[in-house]
Amino acid sequence: MQRNLVVLLFLGMVALSSCGLREKHVQKLVKYAVPVGTLRTILQTVVHKVGKTQFGCPAYQGYCDDHCQDIKKEEGFCHGFKCKCGIPMGF
């Protein structure tokens, strides 16, 4: 039961954040909806990481390249959760 509630809350937050709500609004929802503890910390971390993701780069690497081709005519590289145009990964 508790696991189902967590999954439902998480999916609800993802849906809300994808329809134009900013990260701080979703964080406030987590703060009031989830009791203090490890679960709240985990959900806040997940919301923060999802909020920082640009152009779906971890899920679909080609999207970042398409974005950079459109705006700068350069090759796009996924650096963690951010797209960088013309800056290759330097390991």
UniProtKB/Swiss-Prot annotation:
InterPro entries given for it?
A: Long_scorpion_toxin_alpha/beta (IPR029237)
Which domain of life does this protein belong to?
Answer: Eukaryota
Q: Where is the signal peptide?
A: 1-19
Q: Which cysteines are joined by disulfide bonds?
A: C57-C78, C64-C83, C68-C85
Q: Name one GO cellular component term.
A: extracellular region
Q: In which tissues is it expressed?
A: Expressed by the venom gland.
Propiece span(s): 20-27
- GO molecular function terms listed in the Swiss-Prot or TrEMBL record: potassium channel regulator activity; toxin activity
Limits of the BetaSPN-type CS-alpha/beta domain: 54-91
Q: Where in the cell is it found?
A: Secreted
Pfam families tied to this protein: Scorpion_toxin_alpha-beta
Task: Please provide the record's keywords in A-Z order.
Answer: Disulfide bond, Ion channel impairing toxin, Neurotoxin, Potassium channel impairing toxin, Secreted, Signal, Toxin, Voltage-gated potassium channel impairing toxin
Oligomeric form and interacting partners: Monomer (both chains).
Q: Which family does it belong to?
A: Belongs to the long chain scorpion toxin family. Class 1 subfamily.
This chain belongs to the protein called Potassium channel toxin AaTXK-beta
Organism name: Androctonus australis (Sahara scorpion)
Q: What is the lineage of its organism?
A: Eukaryota, Metazoa, Ecdysozoa, Arthropoda, Chelicerata
